[in-house]
Every structure is written in structure tokens, then in C-alpha cells.
């Protein structure tokens, strides 16, 4: 009887160990609208239409930006995020980004556009956060991962 209780206790412990979660560390990258292009040549050569960044907020692995620009309705605007590939050797490290807006609308009305970008390509091995400096945005953003 003593061995029976011991075996039941061992089986119960083994059963409890099976209830651990296997998928809690899976990143959700589907929620961002687009990627960041990490390319210094594109960063240097890209020209943008005029815009104003209203907000830039990091949530999980997504940078959510809200911009304002003139146009007819903003439906054909193309907004992209470029990284310079330059990494400032500070602690935490810093990266330099640029938003590129292609706006071929010739109207004088002002519209806003929201878009998100997947920041996971900007991670740096050996650290768990990076400071992001977006051109023409006054605040540096801290991306923790």
C-alpha cells in the first residue's frame, strides 16, 4: 500500500509537469503593417514628401506612427521606414531611422495616416533594448525586447 501511494504521487507530479505552456514565448509579428528596410544606400538616397509626425509609439515589436500631410484623401500614400545600418556604440545602442512618404496627391486638404512597422529586424545581439532616433522627430524612442 505504501508503494502504491508513492507511485500515485509520482504519477500526479508527472501529470502536473505536463501542464507547462509551450507557446508563451512565440512573438506575434503579424500585427504590424510592414517591415523596416535596413539598408544604408536606400536610407541615404530616399527622398520624402513633406509630412509631420504626430505620434510615434512602440508597442511590443511594432512602431506605430501617425503622420499628417496634405493630399486629396491619403488613400494612395506610401509610407516606409528605413534604417541607416549605423549603430551608435552607446549603452543602450542607438539606431537611426527615417520615414519616407511618397505622396503624389496635389490637393490642399490635410489628412492623417497611421501605420505600424515591425521592429524585430533592429534587434542587436547581446542587449535587450535599443534607442531609436527617427529623423525630424524630436524624441528618441526606447525599443525593449
Give residue ranges: language-model regions:
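Mature extracytoplasmic domains of secretory-pathway proteins
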Residues: 58-105
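Surface-exposed edge beta-strand/loop patches
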Residues: 119-145
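Bacterial Sec-dependent N-terminal signal peptides
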Residues: 14-38
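N-terminal edge beta-strand
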Residues: 42-56
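Peripheral peptide segments
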Residues: 33-45, 87, 93
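Extracellular low-complexity Ser/Thr/Asn/Gly-rich intrinsically disordered segments
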Residues: 22-23, 32, 59-63, 140
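Short, solvent-exposed, Trp/other aromatic-anchored flexible loops in extracytoplasmic proteins
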Residues: 99-129
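Sec-dependent bacterial lipoprotein signal peptides
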Residues: 1-20
Amino acid at each position: 500500500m505504501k508503494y502504491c501511494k508513492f507511485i500515485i504521487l509520482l504519477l500526479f507530479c508527472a501529470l502536473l509537469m505536463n501542464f507547462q505552456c509551450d507557446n508563451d514565448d512565440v512573438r506575434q509579428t503579424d500585427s504590424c503593417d510592414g517591415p523596416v528596410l535596413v539598408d544604408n544606400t536606400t536610407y541615404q538616397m530616399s527622398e520624402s514628401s513633406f509630412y509631420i509626425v504626430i505620434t510615434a509609439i512602440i508597442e511590443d515589436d511594432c512602431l506605430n506612427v501617425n503622420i499628417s500631410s496634405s493630399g486629396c484623401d491619403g488613400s494612395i500614400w506610401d509610407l516606409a521606414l528605413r534604417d541607416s545600418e549605423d549603430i551608435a556604440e552607446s549603452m543602450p545602442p542607438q539606431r537611426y531611422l527615417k520615414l519616407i512618404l511618397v505622396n503624389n496627391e496635389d490637393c490642399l486638404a490635410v489628412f492623417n495616416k497611421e501605420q505600424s512597422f515591425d521592429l524585430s529586424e533592429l534587434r542587436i545581439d547581446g542587449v535587450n533594448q535599443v534607442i531609436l532616433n527617427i529623423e525630424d522627430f524630436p524624441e528618441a524612442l526606447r525599443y525593449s525586447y
